[in-house]
Regions:
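N-terminal helix-turn-helix DNA-binding core of bacterial DNA-binding proteins
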Residues: 2-35
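N-terminal positioning helix adjacent to the helix-turn-helix/winged-helix DNA-binding module
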Residues: 6-9, 25, 66, 77, ...
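Basic amphipathic alpha-helical segments that dock to polyanions
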Residues: 10, 29, 40-50
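The short coil/loop that forms the "turn" connecting the two helices of the helix-turn-helix
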Residues: 34-35, 58, 90
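Key DNA-contact positions within bacterial/archaeal DNA-binding proteins
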Residues: 38, 93
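Basic, amphipathic "hinge/linker" alpha-helix immediately C-terminal to the N-terminal HTH DNA-binding motif
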Residues: 59-77
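C-terminal regulatory/oligomerization modules of transcriptional regulators
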Residues: 97-120
Length: 120
């Protein structure tokens, strides 16, 4: 199933927050991304309906297997692309911004070629 860039960003954010927080809530996601809680709630509803997240009765958000798979793929792309750009002399700020855009549009074939080229 195709998933849009916004959904990928939410899933990646949930993954990152789950590594540092005991539980992830919509307010944590809103704070991390600088969005209104109401916007995050709508996105969480869509992710839940597409079986990418589970929301407990207490409002705790966790990734399903499919959500985690997507989040980890996007996170891997982000890390590899940003590090690759910085290794070529791109400033950290620019590399992180560019990686955030590129991670969503690069084909798997091109991403694998970059990984092979840089020896990862």
């Amino acid at each position: 199933m195709a998933i849009n860039e916004s959904a990928e960003n939410y899933l990646e954010t949930i993954l990152m927050l789950s590594k540092t927080l005991p539980v992830v809530r919509a307010v944590d996601i809103a704070n991390e991304l600088g969005f209104k809680k109401s916007s995050v709630s709508i996105a969480m509803k869509n992710l839940r309906e597409n079986n990418h997240i589970i929301v407990s009765g207490a409002g705790y958000i966790s990734l399903t297997d499919s959500g985690k798979e997507i989040a980890e793929m996007i996170f891997e792309r982000h890390e590899l692309i940003s590090n690759w750009l910085m290794s070529m002399g791109v400033s950290e700020e620019t590399a992180l911004e560019d990686a955030c855009k590129m991670e969503h549009v690069i084909s798997q074939e091109s991403f694998e070629a970059i990984k092979k080229f840089i020896g990862k």
